């Protein structure tokens, strides 16, 4: 959704922008192409392989560009260290797992590739998916599968995991896929039986939804008046958080101590309806089929 991202960011030649999910640099390169000599772009990624890719592609040699290894919750710290708080003209968050992560068997994200059951977006993080599965309780696992994967057979799969790990460790993607296939009584001919479970475990291991919520809050704090927040989500759990956040900020509501409080001045204005990838992009990249882009603009105080 590159053209949609650029349209909603409305990149100015002298603006300051933050790409919170560098990946392999596609969005960052396009933003840099629209920046003049005074423009600045900060990229962030929690994956060290993505950070290394910035050097390999030559982007790190551009004086207008900088990259940091970190998470969404680090946005405020990185922006503040550059003296940009309240001056950022646009922030992009492209959620979920990246294509390079999915396609690399040793990262353990894909149920279609045999590899270690890792799933860490940040390889420096301590707990792998295999280690998490070895320790999580049956009740908590069922909750994660139900809440993060919307898996109708969450209880069956959780019970099967606990029974299997009593016999032997679950350490590879193949181990987990076989277990799931055996636990599910009915197969969906349009979806692999492991899809929801792999999504749920990945979200839990990486605290994706918690990081998203923190990142959205950080983003609004550092944006300039008129600055834009653009978020691409890939499943309903992510989109629900983004939609609710933008809606509540546009209404002047915020969560404090589990209770919504009303501000006198809303901080955001929602920019139109959510956008979807076009047919041409979906033909080139089928994973874009589920992408949904939402954008909002920060109001003047």
From Swiss-Prot:
GO molecular function: rRNA (cytosine-N4-)-methyltransferase activity
EC number: 2.1.1.199
Keywords noted in UniProt: Cytoplasm, Methyltransferase, rRNA processing, S-adenosyl-L-methionine, Transferase
GO terms under cellular component: cytoplasm
Localisation per UniProt entry: Cytoplasm
SUPFAM superfamilies, per database record: Putative methyltransferase TM0872, insert domain, S-adenosyl-L-methionine-dependent methyltransferases
Keyword presence, rRNA processing: yes
Record: residues binding S-adenosyl-L-methionine: 25-27, 45, 72, 94, 101
Gene3D superfamilies: Putative methyltransferase TM0872, insert domain, Vaccinia Virus protein VP39
A GO BP annotation: rRNA base methylation
Enzyme class at the top of the EC tree: transferase
Pfam families recorded: Methyltransf_5 (PF01795)
Annotated catalysed reactions: cytidine(1402) in 16S rRNA + S-adenosyl-L-methionine = N(4)-methylcytidine(1402) in 16S rRNA + S-adenosyl-L-homocysteine + H(+)
Main location as per UniProt: cytoplasm
Keyword Methyltransferase: yes
Family: Belongs to the methyltransferase superfamily. RsmH family.
Record's function text: Specifically methylates the N4 position of cytidine in position 1402 (C1402) of 16S rRNA.
Protein name as it appears in the record: Ribosomal RNA small subunit methyltransferase H
């Amino acid at each position: 959704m590159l053209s949609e991202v650029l349209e909603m960011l409305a990149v100015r030649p002298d603006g300051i922008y933050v790409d919170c999910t560098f990946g392999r640099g596609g969005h960052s390169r396009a933003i840099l192409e629209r920046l003049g000599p005074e423009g600045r772009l900060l990229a962030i990624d929690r994956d060290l392989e993505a950070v290394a890719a910035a050097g390999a592609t030559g982007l790190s040699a551009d004086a207008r560009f900088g990259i940091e290894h970190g998470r969404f919750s680090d946005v405020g710290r990185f922006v503040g260290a550059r003296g940009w708080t309240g001056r950022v003209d646009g922030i992009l968050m492209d959620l979920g797992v990246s294509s390079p992560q999915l396609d690399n068997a040793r990262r353990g994200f894909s149920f279609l590739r045999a590899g270690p059951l890792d799933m860490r977006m940040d390889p420096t993080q301590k707990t792998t998916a295999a280690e998490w599965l070895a320790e999580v309780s049956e009740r908590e696992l069922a909750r994660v599968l139900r809440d993060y994967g919307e898996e109708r057979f969450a209880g069956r799969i959780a019970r099967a995991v606990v029974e299997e790990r009593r016999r032997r460790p679950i350490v590879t993607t193949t181990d987990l896929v076989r277990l799931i296939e055996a636990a599910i009584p009915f197969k969906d001919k349009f979806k692999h039986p492991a899809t929801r479970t792999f999504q749920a475990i990945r979200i839990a291991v990486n605290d994706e939804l918690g990081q998203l919520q923190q990142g959205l809050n950080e983003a609004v704090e550092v944006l300039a008046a008129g600055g834009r927040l653009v978020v691409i989500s890939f499943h309903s759990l992510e989109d629900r958080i983004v939609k609710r956040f933008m809606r509540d900020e546009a209404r002047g509501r915020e969560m404090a101590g589990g209770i919504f409080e009303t501000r006198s001045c809303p901080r955001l204005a929602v920019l139109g309806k959510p956008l979807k990838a076009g047919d041409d992009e979906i033909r080139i990249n089928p994973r874009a089929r589920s992408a949904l882009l939402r954008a909002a603009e920060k109001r003047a105080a």
